[in-house]
Structures are given as C-alpha cells and as structure tokens.
C-alpha cells in the first residue's frame, strides 16, 4: 500500500499526539478585536473570539503580512506594523492561534494557515499586537462610530443646492436652491410632490445648516413655468430626459441623513409614466449658523443661537467636531456615551449652529475630558432645541468614566476654503510648502506665504483649512521643498491668527505684501496630523501640596543659575540669607490621542552642568503669582529636564523614562509628576507682601508642541498669604468654569488645605 506524503505526515502527527496544521474555517465569521488605548482604536493586542471566548494570538512567525490581513478584516485600509512580546499587555484566557501564515492578499485570517485552534506552545508574554492605518475602508462602520449613511447611503451620499435666483448664486455658502442628489456620477433632481418642511430640515442639516425657512413656492413655480415654455431651456431638456431621480421623499425631520427617510425612486427612463407629473424640482432655503454668516448679516432674534450655548465642543481638529461638554451647576463637564446616538448628537450640532451630526463617537475618540460627567443615557427625540431639553440621567448614576466621553462630528457648510490652500513639495500629502490663493487686482492668484511671524497657531489654521487635522510643525524655512513653479511669488505676509479662524484668508495680514527677507528659503510650511496630545494638570494635587519654605541661599546656586529666583536675589550677599519659596507638586496628564514628545530630538537637547541633566524643552511650565486684576508680582518657570511617564493607569505600560538618556515623552493616558521637593518647583515670593492673589500655572506656554486643546493648559487658584502662611483654594483648569462663575467663585471662601 502506497502512502502519499500528506497522509504520512498526518499519521506521523497523530502518533506524536499533535493535530496537523489546519486552516481555522470558522474564523471568517468569528470576530477580531484590538485591545489597547481607548483613544487609539486602530492599535492594540489582537484577540479572536472562538467558541464564545476571547483569546489571543501568539507572535511566532507573525509579520507584516499577517498584520495586514488582520487590519483588513477589522475594516482598516492597511497595517502600519505589528508588535511582539505583549507590548499591549498580556491577555487572558486561551491562546487561540499560533504560527499564523498569510500571503498578505487574504481578506480574512480564516484564509491563512496556523497550528489550529488552541494549539500553541506560547505564553501570554508572546501575545501579538497590531497597529493599523487609522483610515477605514469606505462604507465600513466602526464599532465606535455611528455613521449617518443608512441602507441607501451609497445612492444618497451627496446632496447639494443648485441656486436658481441671481442673489442666491452670489451667496457663500449657498443657502437656497433646488435640491439635487448625485447618482451614478450625475446630478439628478428631486420632485417637489409631497415635499414638506421636515424634508427641508433634513436636507439643510446634511448641508451643515441648523434650520430651514419656507420658500416662496409660487414665485419659483412662475420661474419654472417660464423656463419650461422656452424650448432652448436646459431645464426643459433635463425634464424631457426624465432627470428626476427621487419621485417622493417622506422625512420626519429628525433624520440625520436623507438616506434614513422613506424614498420613492422615480421610474426609469423610457417609461410611459413621467417622473414628476405636474410638479417641479424641490426648492429649499436654509439658515446658516453664526460661524458661516456674512459679517454684515443681522443678528438672530433672541432665543436663537446668538445666545451663548450651554454646550461646547473640545479637542476637535476641524470646525464642528469635538468632545461634547455641557455647562451645569456653573461647571463644564462631559457626557457619557451610554445610549449616545446620531439623534442626540444632531441636537448638539444644531444647538451650536451646525447641521445634523455626521458621526456620533464613543469611547473618548476625541480625547478624555476633566471634571464631572454631567449626563448619561441622553435620549433626544430630535426636535429639541438644546441638549438640556432631552431626558437624561446624571453621569454619576451608572459608573461612567472619562474613557466613555461622547463626541460628535457635525455637518458644516462648504465654504470653498479648502480650494484656496494647498501643499507642495512634501514627502507625504500632510506636509509641504504652503501655497494660498488670494485675489490680486480682482484676479485669483496662487502664491506662497512669508514666514515672518509664522507659528504653530497660524499652522493650526492652515491644517484645519486643508482638512488635514492638527499642525505638528510650523516651518519658517522650506528650502528643502520645491513649490509649484507658477506660485513662487509671495502673496501673503504678516499673518497673525487667533486660532479659531476657518481659513488663513480670515486672519490678520499685511495689506500690501511686505516680506523683509524676500521669501526664497524663508517661506511658510506645515506638517499636519489627524491627532494630537492634550496636556491637562491635576488641580487638586496643586491645591493639596502647596506650602512655604525659607530656603538658604547656599542651597540655591543651581536654581539661581537657571533663573528660578526673583531678580532681587542677584543683589543679595551670597551665600548668606534665604529666599521664601511657594512650593507645590504638579501632575500633568496626557489626555489626547497621541504621545506628547519634545519638539526636538535628543541631539538638540541642552546639557545643564549644574544640575547635570538635559533639558528637552527649555520652558515647559510657567508659574506666576498675580494680583486680582492680573498684574504679575512673582514668577517662576520649569524646564523639562525629565519628561517621562511617572505612572500609568492599569492596562497601560510606561514607554518613556529619562534614565540613561532615554526617550522623553508622556504616553496617552499616563502622567508626569514634578514633586514639590525638586529644584525650581516653586515661585519665589520673597518680595511679595501679604494679601489675596491668583496663583497660575501654564504648561507648554509657548505652544512649542502641538496639542488638540490649548484652552485647558492653564490652572488657576485663589491664593491667600498672610506673611507667614499660605492657602490655595478653588484650583481649576482655565476653561472649567464660565466667566460669570469665575467671578462668583472668587467671592467664595472654600479653604480646603492649610499646609504651612
């Protein structure tokens, strides 16, 4: 009897008590997941669900091909890399797969080879992790994203208003016109039969407008009839070709997208029955929110968005997106993502003057907030004017954490700004020499931007206008990038932005262009990224650790060398005497979506001989003592001599440590602690008299490193000093309270510590 090689191998493995290599056939219908940082759903430990139990994958023979297949099965476009040796922590339960072998073209892991289910000689210290490209396949819905497109979303993906009246054509953005939908590459009309204001509300929401107004249908009907009587009219030609695609739409008005409405598609061409008998194209008129109205537009009536809303968005890269925060009990707080959906998210978007919600995001996808979690299980019906009108539970009732902070991405009007800026010469699409389009003598012209005064704030506006997220670098020299040959002329100079502008063209700039160094190699450039870190201080720790110390001058030589003492110390009789120091600890969290890293590499760090350490950021924090009217009476600063992960929450591992000239940074979710007993962790108040003051700490004060939100970089406390003792109270980050609450808090004496 002859034995074939496969049969021999099979029998041999059975004699050894080992099952043969197999291809797990059920994996195609079995779920995969990544277990890692909440703010980075595209990376983590790879786990597989088999027989109702989650298990891990061993890193033996795992490489980029296997990572690519896993990422593709998870809905991501590609894999960036993989991680071995349990980089994302050791898993629990079985190790389901070992020696996974893929070619790289498979659509799922079930098409790859392996040892078989549960057959492994690995331990959990070998659990593999993968890092996928954050961009998902078109149409793929993330488990942490609720997307607006419904079952017919592919056909109804694009909607626009085609202006008819001359006045509407001159308006930017277009707020009134005939509704058109794009189908098979062609724009089609929508019949007005049965058209309601609810339909208009949905269309306006999709286009980024918070509300709709009735149109003069009789006037538009006259225009329609007039054009239909003209045999040369393009409209008559389109109608004869049965260009209507949607015969009838029925919306409730709460839908975030027309795809969620009942849609009756018009009969195909060639049918005897006309698509819109006796009707015409549907016409809609929308009202733009305050961000998108022309400057001369009259303010809205009382009771509209002109009132300061009690909801805001934070840490979003684009206008109309961010973590949802609400104002309750005079304090800003977040919203838990339990039962968070597009209906509730749309109420937030419209309240802020945007359109309906494009996405409702869960799991702190746009960073974690601070302070209280005010709301949970928000249940809006869609007609509410504000989020506070919706039924909800208190956030503390169901154990929500800031890992569950809800966020939104709203529909915003197309202002055309993205077509007025571009990047040239970069290695990747997210970087390059900045080129803008401006009008010169009434003619649009492309050119470059002078780099004088160019900084991270201006670069942030540029990246936002480009739709590329946050700016991570603002380049003042761009000789290493070649621009577009016809855009070499400097057409914009003296750019100064506040950071809230939608486009560089809205920033302050020179009238006539004036670039003293003439441009050339000194042209503005940017590097953008879709996510950024976010540093926030622990206010309670500062308040609890503050005390006074009279420190002898003999122990302050190094601190004096690093300018950590007041100027009066220069005139003292060293080493005799002392300085009175207000000391405290600071704890700085990174609640963003990427690690906080120094601006420069290790080769550029400055060595300080006295303290014998490197400074990766020369001025990392400012410490100030202010009078109640804001005048500075004492100051201090702290260089970043050791930017590291002092500690991390359970489930995250420290990645940065300063020992042995190691890499510096703060991992997402971790924190860096500067204890009260280290040098320069103080404010020198030797020359300050008794009184009431404001104690202020600002981290990353010069914006040297990009962050998703700079408004929470400042911490303030009320400070009482009687000449012998000091009290700090009411410590809070700079944007925790509205302005009127700040004034009220200053009058309240909530003394929580008495540390001398």
Swiss-Prot record:
PANTHER family: LYSYL OXIDASE HOMOLOG 4, LYSYL OXIDASE-LIKE-RELATED. Glycans are attached at residues 198, 629. Residues 533-736 are annotated as: Lysyl-oxidase like. The gene is LOXL4. Disulfide bonds join 58-122, 71-132, 102-112, 191-276, 204-286, 251-261, 336-400, 349-410, 380-390, 450-515, 463-528, 497-507, 558-564, 610-658, 642-648, 670-680, 717-731. The record marks 569-570 as: Cleavage. This is Lysyl oxidase homolog 4. Expressed in many tissues, the highest levels among the tissues studied being in the skeletal muscle, testis and pancreas. Expressed in cartilage. The keyword Cell inner membrane does not apply. It catalyses: L-lysyl-[protein] + O2 + H2O = (S)-2-amino-6-oxohexanoyl-[protein] + H2O2 + NH4(+). The keyword Ion transport does not apply. It is found in: Secreted, Extracellular space. GO terms for molecular function: copper ion binding; protein-lysine 6-oxidase activity. Inhibited by beta-aminopropionitrile (BAPN). It comes from Homo sapiens (Human). The lineage of its organism: Eukaryota, Metazoa, Chordata, Craniata, Vertebrata.
């Amino acid at each position: 009897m002859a034995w074939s090689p496969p049969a021999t191998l099979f029998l041999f493995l059975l004699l050894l008590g080992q099952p043969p290599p197999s291809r797990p056939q059920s994996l195609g219908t079995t779920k995969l997941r990544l277990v890692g940082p909440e703010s980075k759903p595209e990376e983590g430990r790879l786990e597989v669900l088999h027989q109702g139990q989650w298990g891990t994958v061993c890193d033996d023979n795992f490489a980029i091909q296997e990572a690519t297949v896993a990422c593709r099965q998870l809905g991501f476009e590609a894999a960036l890399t993989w991680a071995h040796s349990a980089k994302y922590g050791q898993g629990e339960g079985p190790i389901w797969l070992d020696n996974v072998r893929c070619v790289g073209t498979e659509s799922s892991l079930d098409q790859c080879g392996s040892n078989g289910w549960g057959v492994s000689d690995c331990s959990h210290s070998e659990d593999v992790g993968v890092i996928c490209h954050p961009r998902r396949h078109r149409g793929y819905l993330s488990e942490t994203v609720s997307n607006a497109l419904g079952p017919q979303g592919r056909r109804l993906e694009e909607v626009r208003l085609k202006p008819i009246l001359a006045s509407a054509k001159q308006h930017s953005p277009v707020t009134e016109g005939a509704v058109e939908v794009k189908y098979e590459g062609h724009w089609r009309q929508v019949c007005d039969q049965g058209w309601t204001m609810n339909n208009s509300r949905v269309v306006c929401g999709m286009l980024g407008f918070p509300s709709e107004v009735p149109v003069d249908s009789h006037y538009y009907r006259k225009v329609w009839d007039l054009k239909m009587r003209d045999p040369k009219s393009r409209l008559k030609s389109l109608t004869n070709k049965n260009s209507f695609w949607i015969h009838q739409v029925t919306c409730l008005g709460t839908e975030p997208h027309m795809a969620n409405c009942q849609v009756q598609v018009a009969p195909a061409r060639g049918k005897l029955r006309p698509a819109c008998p006796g009707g015409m194209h549907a016409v809609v008129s929308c009202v733009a929110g305050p961000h998108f109205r022309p400057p001369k537009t009259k303010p809205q009536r009382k009771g509209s968005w002109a009132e300061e809303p009690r909801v805001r968005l934070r840490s979003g890269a684009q206008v109309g997106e961010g973590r949802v925060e609400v104002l309750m009990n005079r304090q800003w707080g977040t919203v838990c993502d339990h039962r968070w959906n597009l209906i509730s998210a749309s109420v937030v978007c419209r309240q802020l003057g945007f359109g309906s919600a494009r996405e409702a995001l869960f799991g702190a996808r746009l960073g974690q907030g601070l302070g209280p979690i005010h709301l949970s299980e928000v249940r809006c019906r869609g007609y509410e004017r504000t989020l506070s009108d919706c039924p909800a539970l208190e956030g503390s009732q169901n154990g929500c954490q800031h890992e569950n902070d809800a966020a939104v991405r709203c529909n915003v009007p197309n202002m055309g700004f993205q077509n007025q800026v571009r990047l040239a010469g970069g290695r990747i699409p997210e970087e390059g020499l900045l080129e803008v389009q401006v009008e010169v003598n009434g003619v649009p012209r492309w050119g470059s931007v002078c780099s004088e005064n160019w900084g991270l704030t201006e670069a942030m506006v540029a990246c936002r206008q480009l739709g590329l997220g946050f700016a991570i670098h603002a380049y003042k020299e761009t000789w290493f990038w070649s621009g577009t040959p016809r855009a070499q002329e400097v057409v914009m100079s003296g750019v100064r932005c506040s950071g809230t502008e939608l486009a560089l063209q809205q920033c302050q700039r020179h009238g006539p262009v004036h670039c003293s160094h003439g441009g050339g190699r000194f042209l503005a450039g940017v590097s953008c990224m879709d996510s950024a870190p976010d540093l926030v201080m622990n206010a309670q720790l500062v308040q609890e650790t503050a005390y006074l110390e009279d420190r002898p001058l003999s122990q302050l030589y190094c601190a004096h060398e690093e300018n950590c003492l007041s100027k009066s110390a220069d005139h003292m009789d060293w080493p005799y005497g002392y300085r009175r120091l207000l000391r405290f600890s600071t704890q700085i969290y990174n609640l963003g979506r990427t690690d906080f890293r120094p601006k420069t590499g290790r080769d550029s760090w400055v060595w300080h001989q006295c303290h014998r350490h490197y400074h990766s950021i020369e001025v990392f924090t400012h410490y100030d003592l202010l009078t109640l009217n804001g005048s500075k009476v004492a100051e201090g600063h702290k260089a970043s001599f050791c930017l590291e992960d002092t500690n991390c929450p359970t489930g995250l591992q420290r990645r940065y440590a300063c020992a042995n000239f190691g890499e510096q940074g703060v991992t997402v979710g971790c924190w860096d602690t500067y204890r009260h007993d280290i040098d320069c962790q103080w404010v020198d108040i030797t020359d300050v008299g008794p009184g009431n003051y404001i104690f202020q700490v600002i981290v990353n004060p010069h914006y040297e490193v990009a962050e998703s939100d700079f408004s929470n970089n400042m911490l303030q406390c009320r400070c009482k000093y009687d000449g012998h003792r000091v009290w700090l109270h009411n410590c809070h980050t700079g944007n925790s309270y509205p302005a009127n609450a700040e004034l009220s808090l200053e009058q309240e004496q909530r003394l929580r510590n008495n540390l001398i």
